């Protein structure tokens, strides 16, 4: 019985088990429909046809024998814009589109009207159309002719000067420049100030032979009197004009009644630029040699270049008789009290005439400048009588507080032996200590001995 049994049931079991395993390995996704059942929503990725998938046996790409050419799809008009430069006109445009179209048409119609109105009001001819190239080449000849307005000549250019006047002014300037070049810098300043005066003032100054007293000015700007001369022997006291000389005339005619009245002595400081601008050519009177005390720098009146053959005590006849304009006027010693303010010590305030003349005769290059001196004073006494008078020398000292004290030094005269005796009687120790080097004096002694105030000057001038 056992042999008669069919072994097929065991084989069937194995086949079933294999099929179950294959089913388990398969993906869980949807299965493809049978070939008879097609879904038009599906599209084949290989051929791009609808109704089957790429793995379907109906795909023509898998079975080329049954492959068919896919039919061409019909064109849909309006889908593609074949002429994009032409706007599409809608059949029923909206209200907004209508307004835009009307606004575009209005300015086109108004353009010719505006042009006509502009031609009427402006009066210009209507614009002509541009000519062709042939016409332009022919009309270019007419464009070369200048049709613009003539240039207007303005007065910005300087007027033309007459050549005769120009030559005359050039010669005058050259002569003036050569004359100034031969003079010292101090005299250049005086000549430049005198040249700034008008012709009328020069004539009045030339006609006046009267000695001019110093004028007292009350104001912030100091004024110094300058008398320009061509010959300046030693002893003449001159000052450099500064900023005040630009506004006031220096040469003024004084009535003869002013001769009897003695003018007040003025002592006014100058701007410091005057002393710094002095070169080596200017004559300055100092102590013996180049020695001077450090704390009290001494500066006397400025002396202009003098004639080499004039002696220290010779007086030209022009000075005695009055002479021409510019003749040197010598300061006369006042009676008794010849110093301003309190009397100074004879050791520091007096110098012998020989010492003064020896200092003045020194060459210009051996005289050092005074950069520390910041002011200069001027004392002017008009000559009452020129008979036998000798020039005076004014000695200036600078104090601690910035003030300046002045003292008069009279030169001995051979014609009047009385005055030198009086002068030597007042200062007996001058001749003895003139050759001895100066002793350094403390500043407090100088301040006590040499302090001069404006009140003391006024009182001394009134007494004299």
From Swiss-Prot:
Domain of life of the source: Eukaryota
InterPro entries, per database record: FAM90, Znf-CCHC_6
Record's compositionally biased regions (Low complexity): 178-197
UniProt-listed Pfam families: zf-CCHC_6 (PF15288)
Biased composition regions of type Basic and acidic residues, renumbered to the chain: 74-83, 97-114
TM region positions: none
Stretches the record annotates as Disordered: 1-42, 70-293, 312-390, 410-442
Similarity-based family: Belongs to the FAM90 family.
Protein name: Protein FAM90A26
């Amino acid at each position: 019985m056992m042999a008669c049994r069919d072994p097929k049931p065991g084989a069937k079991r194995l086949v079933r088990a294999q099929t179950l395993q294959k089913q388990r390995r398969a993906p869980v996704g949807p299965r493809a429909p049978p070939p008879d059942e097609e879904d038009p929503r599906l599209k084949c990725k290989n051929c791009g046809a609808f109704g089957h998938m790429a793995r379907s046996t109906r795909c023509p790409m898998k079975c080329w024998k049954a492959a068919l050419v896919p039919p061409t799809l019909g064109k849909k008009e309006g889908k593609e814009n074949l002429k994009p430069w032409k706007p599409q006109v809608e059949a029923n445009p909206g209200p907004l589109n209508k307004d835009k179209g009307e606004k575009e048409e209005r300015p086109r119609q108004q353009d010719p009207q505006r042009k006509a109105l502009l031609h009427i009001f402006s009066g210009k001819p209507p614009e002509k159309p541009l000519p062709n190239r042939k016409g332009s080449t022919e009309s270019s000849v007419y464009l070369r002719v200048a049709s613009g307005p003539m240039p207007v000549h303005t007065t910005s250019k300087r007027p033309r000067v007459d050549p005769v006047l120009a030559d005359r002014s050039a010669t005058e300037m050259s002569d003036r420049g050569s004359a100034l070049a031969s003079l010292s810098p101090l005299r250049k300043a005086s000549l430049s100030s005198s040249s700034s005066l008008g012709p009328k003032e020069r004539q009045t100054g030339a006609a006046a032979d009267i000695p001019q007293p110093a004028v007292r000015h009350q104001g912030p700007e100091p004024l110094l009197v300058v008398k320009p001369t061509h010959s300046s022997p030693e002893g003449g006291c001159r000052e450099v004009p500064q900023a005040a000389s630009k506004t006031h005339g220096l040469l003024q005619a004084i009535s003869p009644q002013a001769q009897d009245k003695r003018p007040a002595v003025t002592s006014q400081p100058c701007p410091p630029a005057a002393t710094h601008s002095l070169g080596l050519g200017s004559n300055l009177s100092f102590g013996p040699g180049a020695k001077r005390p450090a704390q009290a720098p001494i500066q006397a009146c400025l002396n202009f270049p003098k004639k080499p053959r004039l002696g220290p005590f010779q007086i030209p006849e022009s000075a005695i008789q009055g002479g021409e304009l510019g003749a040197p006027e010598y300061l006369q010693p006042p009676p008794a009290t010849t110093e301003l303010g309190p009397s100074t010590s004879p050791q520091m305030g007096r110098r012998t005439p020989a010492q003064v003349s020896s200092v003045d005769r020194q060459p210009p290059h051996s005289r050092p400048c005074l950069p520390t001196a910041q002011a200069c004073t001027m004392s002017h006494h008009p000559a009452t009588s020129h008979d036998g008078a000798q020039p005076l020398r004014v000695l200036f000292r600078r104090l601690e507080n910035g003030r300046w004290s002045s003292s008069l030094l009279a030169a001995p005269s051979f014609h009047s032996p009385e005055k030198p005796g009086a002068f030597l009687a007042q200062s007996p120790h001058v001749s003895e200590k003139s050759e001895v080097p100066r002793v350094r004096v403390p500043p407090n002694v100088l301040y006590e001995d040499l302090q001069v105030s404006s009140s003391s000057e006024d009182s001394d001038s009134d007494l004299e």
